[in-house]
């Protein structure tokens, strides 16, 4: 039996630079630590988050701070990235696999370019739910101004396909909440209001009943214990003693899971949605690499060719300024790996303009573990130029 745990949800703060994402992250942990007991609730200071450890996601260095907190009903893992470029990379690479996002908007500025960009990205990478934290409300006396900013955000969310009229918008001040001694002041109540909005979000359907699959983010060698791979379990359950395969980039290898760890605790099992470390029997560190997947035996194969529906970003969205033609060769970011591939355009299509939606055929340089419905990003020269979804596997 997997031990009974509180339902787990992955959230992240998104929004424009300097609107207060990191301050809010600090305020959430601090107010909850004062208000609620729970081993997950420890207050984390702003500069601990701001000097976030660097992670490698798809070969790109990203600073991400992971904090955890819990309410009576749920356990939250929360990711905050101090840098703007880090957010973009993080959302596309899935390093911040968010079930829900807290969109932070400063009441003094309203929606800004990155606000739009982050909402668009959240939609493209499949973040289902958003709640809004209107920050810095302590410095705006004008009620009408606050209402205008709120209306603007709701319209923006609707424009990108979120239910803008129904989304919770909480007006608060993260700085003021941090200053309050007890955790029960007027601004701390606003933090609790935000938590209540998060509590209302329907729990993501974790694909626990499907065969186990986890994309490998990192590989470590632990003296005396062997090789550990880390990543987020995409679907299924892994128990100590289960047979598993390592698929993609190389020949398939078979091994056995000899340990599961999460937040430095040993567990009997890990399940969909968990960020876990898996100990592998008889596998050396050099036998396995980031970008491969761990899978229940026989469930996934690696392929080089597929068809996909892609959206090519406009220049204003940070995409290409010029069209591309058949045989264009960008990088494809699939799960935790990036591989060069060749794009073949459909019959009769000469070129693709920024802003186009198109069906393409892709031939990758190396075989990667993929399946239908999988999302990926297309990048070139350090920037994202498109995103897509696999519609058909060819070989």
Swiss-Prot record:
Name this polypeptide is given: Elongation factor Tu
Region annotation G2: where it falls in the sequence: 59-63
SUBUNIT field: Monomer.
Region entry G5, spans: 173-175
Alphabetical list of InterPro entries matching this protein: EF-Tu_GTP-bd, EF-Tu_GTPase, EFTu-like_2, EFTU_2, G_TR_CS, P-loop_NTPase, Small_GTP-bd, T_Tr_GTP-bd_dom
Enzyme class: hydrolase
Function, in words: GTP hydrolase that promotes the GTP-dependent binding of aminoacyl-tRNA to the A-site of ribosomes during protein biosynthesis.
Location within or outside the cell: Cytoplasm
One GO location term (cellular component): cytosol
Native source species: Ehrlichia canis (strain Jake)
Annotated binding of GTP, by residue: 15-22, 80-84, 135-138
Residues binding Mg(2+), per UniProt: 22
